[in-house]
Amino acid sequence: MAQNQQPIFQTKPPEQFVQIPINIERDSSTTRMNQTGNTIRKPNHWPTITISIIFVIIGQSIAKLLENFYYDKTNRSEYNENRQNDGVWTQSLLQTVGFPLLLLPFLIFITKNKRNHHQQPPITSDSIHLKSLAVIYICIGIIMSVQGRLAAMGKLEIPFGVFTLIYTAQLFFTPIFAAFINKIKFNRWVVISVILAIITGALTLSSSFGGEPDEAEENYARGSWAALFAGICFALLLCNIQNVFDSYIFKRTESTNQKPSFASVFEVIIFSSLVATIISVVGLLIAGEQHDLKREMNGFSKGKGSYVMAMVGQAVSWQVYWVGIVGLVYSVSSVLSNVISVITWPIVSVLVVIFFNFMDDEFDAFKGVALVTAVLSAAAYFFRLHKDNRMAY
């Protein structure tokens, strides 16, 4: 009888010994998530964060410059009220249609991870897991397409300064969604960073835009609602992307004792953009914008070649931007990703002053202060990340 009980007595301590460190590790990662929005990504990988920020700045700056160039050279001043919103589905499409460019780096990352670290591909073979991810990617793709169309419509309905003020509201909604969806709690440094980012976005109200409507074309009711819901959609988009990482991808790699791979960033962008592209193409065809594209190309003041280059350049630049934005969600959180996206607006506005001359736009005090608050906003968040990294060791 004693011999039969002996193996049972010996098997219990190993079970307790293995279980204790797992629980401690998860609890510690949850504590870090409550402070900065970071989960099991510990410590923060500064090279990845830095490269992602550079991608956001470069991608957003070039995309916005080419967008201004597109609207400035399509002679929109000659459009009547019925054609004011021409191209909104096209602009939404340009934000996602370049996703095939990410297939090559996606495959390279997968191959490298399998060869060097014997990691499984980012896409799991679990059918239940695949179905859940498929539903989430479809939802994210829908949000991406709707957000792109609403933002494009808002900029064509109201003055760009008003659009910017309303669109900045995304920074109010991102922390709210992050608290409910991602279970993030905020410390004072993150709150300070968000407040400074809101001020930065609001101070870019003096910026101009090539597709800005004339006074007779303004529709404040429709344009304001479009700008507001575009901001809400962007905040919801970022928080859902973080939910994909935290609830699916990171748990998947954690269960197999593997480190998260940046290939998952490309995975999220590619599948979500595929859905968004399909929706935008359908919307474009229903709205009849395919006929507008030919008319715009023929009437483009810089020629057909410049028109094609502007469109292709936007598609490529937006993919660079998305890699940076989703990379920041992957590395840190949806909140930092939104903060970085907004505080790069002053850089874009300064570049518009340099390359264009919309309504005698110039570098004024608002743009100068916006650049300062942008730096302070980033510094506040990075200071908190630095403290978290020190605590992690």
UniProtKB/Swiss-Prot annotation:
Keywords: Acetylation, Cell membrane, Cytokinin signaling pathway, Membrane, Transmembrane, Transmembrane helix, Transport. The keyword NADP does not apply. The modification N-acetylalanine is found at A2. The chain crosses the membrane at residues 46-66, 90-110, 133-153, 161-181, 189-209, 225-245, 268-288, 308-328, 339-359, 363-383. InterPro entries: PUP_plant. Its main location: membrane. Pfam families: PUNUT. Expressed in seedlings, leaves, embryos, ovules, seeds and the root and shoot meristems. In heart-stage embryos, detected in cells that failed to respond to cytokinins, including the prospective cotyledons. One of its GO terms (biological process) is cytokinin transport. GO terms for cellular component: membrane; plasma membrane. GO terms for molecular function: purine nucleobase transmembrane transporter activity; purine nucleoside transmembrane transporter activity. It is found in: Cell membrane. It is a multi-pass membrane protein. Purine permease implicated in ATP-dependent cytokinin translocation that controls the spatiotemporal landscape of cytokinin signaling. Depletes ligands from the apoplast, which leads to a suppression of the cytokinin response. Belongs to the purine permeases (TC 2.A.7.14) family. This is Purine permease 14. It comes from Arabidopsis thaliana (Mouse-ear cress). The gene is PUP14.
